[in-house]
């Protein structure tokens, strides 16, 4: 029963979060993202847990990104620099591989969360659209059973070039 409830809640959270992104006008057509370091600002004041508002503190992460648009579709690789400077193959927690589909970029990574007072492995899905000014607007959906899904909106802004000591995978090779 509780697994069914969690799956239903997760489906609802992803659907509602994604729907919010999909109804927001995006760019005219997909193109490679600008290479650089982005500040992802998560708005904790709008966080929901299991679909219920549960405000928390806001926070940010710096993610270094590279992208390419080969004939098979646009791909961006990212590395959460709060983990360290070296990009490691997924499923490393800091590694992100975004794929573009209909002007929406989506990546899922595994991540460690605190759930019911203990550390659990779960997943985080980041989904965003690129606005005309280059800003990303999207949601983070965190799933860690047996706890309910957590959805937090974010914006991301390019803050500079990728630091020379930060390694980000070639998006043409993932």
How would you describe each model-predicted region?
Residues 2-10, 18-39:
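C-terminal region of N-terminal signal peptides and the immediate post-cleavage residues
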Residues 31-54, 78-83, 136-138, 166, ...:
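Tryptophan-anchored aromatic micro-motifs
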Residues 45-54, 114-119, 143-151:
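Flexible, membrane-facing loop/turn or short amphipathic-helix motifs
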Residues 140-174:
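Edge beta-strand at a domain terminus
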Residues 122-144, 153:
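Internal, hydrophobic beta-strand segments that form the core of beta-sheet-rich folds
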């Amino acid at each position: 029963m509780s697994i069914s409830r969690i799956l239903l809640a997760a489906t609802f959270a992803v659907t509602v979060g994604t729907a919010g992104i999909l109804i927001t006008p995006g760019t005219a057509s997909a193109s490679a993202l600008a290479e650089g370091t982005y500040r992802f600002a998560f708005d904790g004041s709008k966080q929901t847990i299991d679909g219920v508002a549960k405000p928390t503190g806001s926070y940010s992460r710096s993610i270094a990104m590279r992208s390419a648009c080969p004939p098979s579709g646009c791909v961006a690789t990212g590395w959460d620099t709060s983990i360290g400077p070296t990009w490691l193959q997924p499923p490393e927690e800091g590694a992100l591989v975004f794929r573009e589909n209909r002007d929406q970029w989506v990546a899922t990574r595994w991540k460690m969360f605190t759930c019911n007072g203990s550390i659990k492995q779960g997943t985080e899905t980041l989904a965003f659209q690129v606005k005309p000014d280059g800003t990303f607007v999207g949601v983070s959906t965190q799933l860690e059973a047996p706890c309910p899904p957590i959805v937090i909106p974010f914006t991301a802004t390019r803050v500079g070039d990728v630091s020379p000591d930060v390694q980000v995978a070639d998006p043409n090779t993932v």
